[in-house]
């Protein structure tokens, strides 16, 4: 969030320097990422008055004698410009000066004539017409006539200013504006806040009727609109142009600038519809119809679906709600009547639409963090005041204010001074706390029993309980009042890893030995992750516990699966150019018995495995699982099972001792197609995921593994090449082979072949069988008998033939 120092000074009587204010903001919890001086890179550039000038013979140059006050009254400087005259004041970069971009000015000869500096254009000082009029003229920047020679150029052209680039945390959407930061500055300095003027008068009745309705109040809690006729397009005043320019925006026209100015100043996004382009004089806020299209103001076309909220006229969408207006309803030089819109839209709706369409804007950035329901009222009033002040149009009596029926109420928190001080660990005088809260626009009603009834401002939706009040108090009172103390610690004991910790460490080492790296993700994500994996609405995984005070909507529920987090890690790696990798994560998932929860959820330890890359396949993850099985002296079996997020033909469920441990396989094609990665990556990437109930896995492990002496008798190996239908699962074959005889101690698939010689719909799978008996040598007759039984069972149960 970029906030000009000069704009803050218009709203608060600031009596400290920009550097001092930066420190104060930081001490109150606002990180100033950068304090940008507008005159950065400029030194020894002063006002110079041209007292003599004559053409430099044989060149296009003009020799000037310049009065630079204390720096010299007759400094000779040559210039190639031709727009100046005697007596003009211009910027003079003297010998040894610097300009933006690291340009250094030295005295030198120009076409044989000594020049002791350079006369500057506005562009050479980093200016444009919005910052200082005349800056974009071809030639020198002509300064006001009353400029004093020798004066530093910065205050003359408005470069004696700073831009605060402030990082706004997710819980403070009210600070996404100049006014929001000004409120904090006023509280910090103990100064009054000068609210922007918001009064206006209606001057005429509407000359036509307009229909405005909201069909999705759950996604649009408040929608306000006001009709303004006889629009008069013109240039914006200099002060407004400068405000916009300091925040990185160019002036377009007075009406467009008012909407942008309101966004920056009040933090309220707004839009203006050209009523001559609104079919049926009708505005409706609704969900989009599947397949509807809209072309936005930046000339991008989007195909919509019911997950997108739109503003429509009687025929078509005219705006993406909370993101950007449509090109089919925008104002132009012929606009004569406008409907100004201010609204609040659901954060989730704007965020999902913005992400799905890849369309971001200053408006969507604010709506995604949250705009309170009182904000449209203030934003619209401010915009209408500016319409009146700049004489942009005639404000009619026709206005709309549609809500979801909920009243605007301040949050009330009943607490005591002792509770607040208990959170802080220090004693703060009661009156000091009351004064701080009042400076922050809270009201404090002291009750007869000594408790406080504190009401928060309407824009402070982040304040929920007395610990929030404690935070407000201490950040204004000063964190330096908290006395550092040593932590109370228990006596140090010589501990060690318990059985569960040892097993977890062993699991991680087994996976690391197979080339897998451990990932670590947050325990939260959003319900959108379930949509990403196409998890059905009735699935138990969707019973996620919602966080009461989430950092953001992206981290609003406790995870019930690790797979969404693992997939996001893989996508992030692909976006950053990591084309291949193997990852695992061992962490708890949080399963509620019912919602809303009335008891502690079950934290179930889970293992997730991910592999991605052109060379990875189904057997990468299966091999990792087999490595775990071998490490814990277990035998896994596999069965075909359909899961929403895995490919139906390249996935399986894992079992051990009859217990289902989890699933693994290739990411479903339709999910892969929706990933926010380049198309060539989607076409070339193989993404495989597996998720296991780690507690169920460990329940199959029979205590500590014991040393087993090697059998004195040699094991016998036999390879079988089998031909079967494509539909036959490898796991079914393995299970059938193992059940044929207790002599079979190991079964490994080592080859799969498909070819025309096998016939359509057929495949060949080659298995290596190990036969052994710890008590005796396995005879040839036993081997032949076992192999014969294996083949017979395979043919009878699965229709498999020997190749």
Predicted segments with their positions:
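Beta-rich nucleic-acid/ligand-interaction surfaces
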Residues: 39-43, 200-203, 455, 491-492, ...
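Terminal amphipathic helices with adjacent charged low-complexity linkers/tails
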Residues: 185, 189-214, 391-420
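Extended, well-folded interaction surfaces typified by the phenylalanyl-tRNA synthetase beta subunit core
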Residues: 180, 413-579, 718, 770-775, ...
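Conserved mixed alpha/beta core segments that line enzyme active sites in large multi-domain catalysts
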Residues: 33, 47-78, 246, 259-328
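Phosphate-backbone binding interfaces of nucleic-acid-interacting proteins
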Residues: 1-202, 339, 358, 362, ...
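Mobile "lid/hinge" segments at catalytic clefts and subdomain interfaces of large enzymes
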Residues: 114-130, 135-140, 154, 162, ...
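A carboxyl-terminal module marker
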Residues: 2, 20, 27, 439-442, ...
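Glycine/proline-enriched, intrinsically flexible loops and inter-domain linkers
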Residues: 5, 23, 53-55, 189, ...
């Amino acid at each position: 969030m970029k906030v000009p120092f000069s704009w803050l000074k218009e709203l608060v009587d600031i009596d400290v320097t920009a550097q001092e204010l930066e420190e104060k903001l930081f001490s109150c919890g606002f990180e100033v990422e950068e304090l940008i001086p507008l005159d950065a890179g400029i030194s020894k550039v002063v006002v110079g008055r041209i007292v003599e000038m004559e053409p430099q013979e044989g060149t296009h140059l003009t020799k000037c004698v310049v009065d630079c006050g204390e720096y010299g009254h007759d400094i000779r400087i040559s210039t190639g410009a031709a727009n100046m005259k005697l007596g003009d004041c211009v910027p003079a970069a003297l010998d040894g000066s610097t300009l933006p971009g690291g340009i250094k000015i030295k005295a030198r000869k120009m076409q044989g004539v000594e020049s002791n500096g350079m006369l500057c254009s506005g562009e050479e000082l980093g200016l444009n017409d919005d910052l200082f009029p005349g800056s974009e003229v071809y030639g020198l920047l002509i300064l006001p006539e009353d400029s004093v020679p020798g004066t530093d150029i910065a205050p003359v052209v408005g470069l004696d200013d700073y831009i605060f680039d402030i990082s706004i945390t997710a819980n403070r959407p009210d600070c996404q504006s100049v006014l929001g930061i000004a409120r904090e500055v006023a509280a910090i300095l103990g100064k009054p806040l000068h609210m922007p003027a918001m009064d206006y008068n209606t001057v005429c009745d509407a000359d036509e009727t307009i229909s405005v309705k909201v069909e999705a109040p759950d996604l649009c809690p408040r929608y306000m609109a006001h009709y303004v006729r006889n629009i008069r397009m013109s240039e914006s005043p200099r002060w407004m142009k400068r405000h916009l320019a300091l925040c990185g925006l160019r002036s377009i026209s007075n009406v467009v600038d008012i909407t942008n100015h309101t966004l920056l100043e009040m933090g309220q996004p707004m839009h203006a519809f050209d009523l001559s382009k609104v079919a049926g004089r009708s505005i409706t806020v609704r969900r989009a119809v599947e397949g509807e299209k809209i072309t936005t103001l930046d000339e991008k076309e989007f195909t919509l679906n019911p997950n997108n909220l739109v503003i429509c006229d009687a025929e078509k969408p005219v705006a993406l709600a909370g993101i950007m207006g449509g090109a089919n309803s925008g104002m132009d030089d012929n606009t004569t009547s406008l409907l100004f819109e201010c609204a609040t839209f659901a954060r989730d709706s704007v965020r999902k639409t913005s992400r799905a369409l890849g369309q971001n804007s200053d408006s969507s950035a604010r709506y995604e963090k949250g705009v309170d329901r009182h904000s449209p009222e203030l934003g619209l009033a401010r915009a209408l005041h500016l319409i009146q002040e700049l004489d942009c149009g005639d404000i009619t009596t026709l206005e709309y204010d549609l809500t979801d029926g909920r009243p605007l109420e301040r949050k009330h928190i009943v607490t005591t001074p002792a509770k607040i001080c208990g959170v802080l660990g220090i004693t703060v005088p009661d009156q000091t706390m009351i004064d701080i809260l009042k400076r922050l626009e809270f009201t404090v009603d002291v009750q007869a029993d000594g408790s406080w009834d504190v009401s928060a401002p309407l824009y402070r939706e982040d304040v929920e309980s007395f610990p929030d009040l404690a935070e407000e108090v201490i950040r204004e009172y000063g964190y330096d009042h908290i006395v550092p103390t040593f932590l109370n610690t228990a006596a140090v004991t010589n501990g060690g890893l318990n059985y569960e910790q040892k097993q977890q460490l062993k699991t991680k080492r087994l996976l690391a030995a197979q080339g897998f790296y451990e990932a670590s993700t947050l325990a939260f994500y959003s319900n959108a992750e379930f949509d990403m994996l196409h998890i059905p609405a009735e699935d138990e995984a969707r019973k996620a516990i919602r966080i009461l005070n989430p950092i953001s909507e992206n981290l609003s529920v406790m995870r019930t699966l690790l797979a969404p987090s693992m997939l996001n890690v893989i996508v992030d790696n692909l976006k950053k150019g990591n084309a291949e990798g193997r990852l695992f994560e061992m962490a708890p998932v949080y399963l509620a018995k019912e919602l809303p929860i009335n008891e502690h959820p079950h934290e179930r330890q889970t293992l997730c495995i991910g592999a991605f890359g052109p060379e990875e396949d189904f057997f990468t993850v299966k091999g990792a699982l087999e490595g775990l099985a071998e490490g814990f002296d277990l035998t896994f079996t596999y069965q075909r099972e359909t899961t929403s997020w895995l490919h139906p033909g390249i996935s399986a469920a894992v079992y051990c001792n009859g217990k289902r441990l989890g699933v693994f396989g290739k990411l479903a094609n339709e999910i892969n197609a929706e990933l926010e990665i380049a198309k060539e990556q989607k076409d070339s990437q193989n993404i495989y995921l597996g998720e296991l109930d780690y507690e169920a896995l460990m329940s199959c492990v029979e205590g500590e593994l014991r040393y087993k002496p090697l059998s004195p008798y040699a094991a016998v190996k036999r390879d079988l090449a089998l031909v079967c239908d494509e539909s036959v699962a490898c796991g079914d074959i393995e299970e059938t082979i193992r059940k044929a005889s207790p002599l079979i101690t190991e079964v490994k698939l080592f080859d799969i072949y498909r070819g025309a010689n096998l016939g359509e719909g057929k495949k060949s799978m080659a298995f290596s069988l190990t036969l052994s008996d710890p008590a005796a040598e396995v005879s040839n007759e036993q081997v032949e008998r076992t192999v014969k039984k294996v083949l017979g069972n395979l043919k009878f149960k699965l229709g498999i033939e020997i190749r």
